Amino acid sequence: MKLHELQPAAGSRKVRNRVGRGTSSGNGKTSGRGQKGQKARSGGGVRLGFEGGQTPLFRRLPKRGFLNINRKEYAIVNLDQLNAFEDGAEVTPVVLIEAGIVKAEKSGIKILGNGELTKKLTVKAAKFSKSAEEAITAKGGSVEVI
């Protein structure tokens, strides 16, 4: 085998389709755009959601709800995730981010009661569910709303 004899693997390199190069090429004359009309012209085409003048779907459907600009979205942490910390540790939002349990604090961190807590911890967060608060205090830990 010589350097000039090297060939790419079969089917690994697709040949570019050259349009408008004669009718016998299969893509001549209209270049795969069909006959005349808006879509055959250069820069032609209809805008997104246009249905030929018929009332588009997004206008036929009723409006629903609104977006509250003052909404608060909390980063959620479950009790079983808190078992990653050592017994007697203080768990704060900064510690949770450093440990990789939470990506971003958002409007604060909310602790939920899914799973089982096996360690005594001091947990500081923006919100707690009742079950989470009870589980933390039952293990001898403490809860602090910040």
From Swiss-Prot:
A molecular function (GO) held by this record is:
rRNA binding
InterPro entries registered for this protein in UniProt:
Ribosomal_uL15 (IPR030878), Ribosomal_uL15/eL18 (IPR021131), Ribosomal_uL15/eL18_sf (IPR036227), Ribosomal_uL15_bac-type (IPR005749), Ribosomal_uL15_CS (IPR001196)
Q: Biased composition, Gly residues: where in the chain?
A: 23-35, 42-51
Record has Ribosomal protein as a keyword = yes
Q: Name one GO biological process term.
A: translation
Region annotation (Disordered) ranges: 1-51
One Pfam family, short name please?
Ribosomal_L27A
Q: In this entry, which stretches build a coiled coil? A: none
What PROSITE patterns does the record tag this protein with? RIBOSOMAL_L15
Which keywords belong to this entry? Answer: Ribonucleoprotein, Ribosomal protein, RNA-binding, rRNA-binding
Per the record, its GO cellular-component terms are: cytosolic large ribosomal subunit
Q: Which PANTHER family match?
A: 50S RIBOSOMAL PROTEIN L15, LARGE RIBOSOMAL SUBUNIT PROTEIN UL15M
Q: Give the quaternary structure.
A: Part of the 50S ribosomal subunit.
- Stated family: Belongs to the universal ribosomal protein uL15 family.
Describe its function.
Answer: Binds to the 23S rRNA.
Q: What is this protein called?
A: Large ribosomal subunit protein uL15
